[in-house]
Amino acid sequence: MRKIAIYGKGGIGKSTTTQNTVAGLVEMGRKVMVVGCDPKADSTRLLLHGLAQKTVLDTLRDEGEDVELEDVMKKGFKDTSCVESGGPEPGVGCAGRGIITSINLLEQLGAYDDDKQLDYVFYDVLGDVVCGGFAMPIRDGKAQEVYIVCSGEMMAMYAANNICKSIHKFGKVGDVRLGGLICNSRKVDNEANMIGEFAKKLGTQMIHFVPRDNMVQHAEINRKTVIDYAPDHSQADEYRTLASKIDNNTMMVIPNPLSIQELEDLLIGFGIMN
């Protein structure tokens, strides 16, 4: 079983990219569980066709300790297992702590047991804030592979570089490795070349460049992944390609994060900063 965490700055398209990639993997016959680690609890919406899923933390609050696996796990597109950790009430408590509680509960309830025959577990994690809780999937060995969703925008690259600092730190003492950057295009000038160069400087790869296409929004409005909503569209093939590249990826590295100066020099070199 491969345990993969998808990180990236808020609003970059992590949840969309994760769910569309998972749709590509299950279409290939892989058995996948998705664990949403974002307080917004929108990491499985497209796989579940918009059914609002009760989060692990809400279930624990309502039911106490007497929780069964089926109370927190729903079956989505092509039998994908879907879980949302959820978060505390706004302004109270720590969202990162919720992730820790959720993953521990899933382990106790046997979600990862051999009889589930999972090929993949995906953690979709809020990534601007690399606080202890959000870093938990990579800190405590819950995920061995990380993919960072970014774009050619300055803040997306800044967040990606910060996430690499975490992987660098925990990779030295554990098993976590960076599998690559996924560029979710924002149509920035020279974007593919810049993210390719950024990846090279980090010591990794841009595993795929996902072009911007309105079909993604059309599918989301219909509460589906592109592969589910428009399987013959070229954008569906982009996600199939990304899924296949992840499925075959063997390049796992401890990244070397850039200094702020190096990052700014890269942005200036590609004309993003003056």
Curated annotation (Swiss-Prot):
It is an enzyme of class 1 (oxidoreductase). InterPro entries: NifH/chlL_CS (IPR030655), NifH/frxC (IPR000392), Nitrogenase_Fe_NifH (IPR005977), P-loop_NTPase (IPR027417). The reversible ADP-ribosylation of Arg-97 inactivates the nitrogenase reductase and regulates nitrogenase activity. The modification ADP-ribosylarginine is found at R97. [4Fe-4S] cluster binds at C94, C131. The keyword ATP-binding applies. ATP binds at G8, K9, G10, G11, I12, G13, K14, S15. Its EC number is 1.18.6.1. Belongs to the NifH/BchL/ChlL family. The key enzymatic reactions in nitrogen fixation are catalyzed by the nitrogenase complex, which has 2 components: the iron protein and the molybdenum-iron protein. This is Nitrogenase iron protein. The gene is nifH.
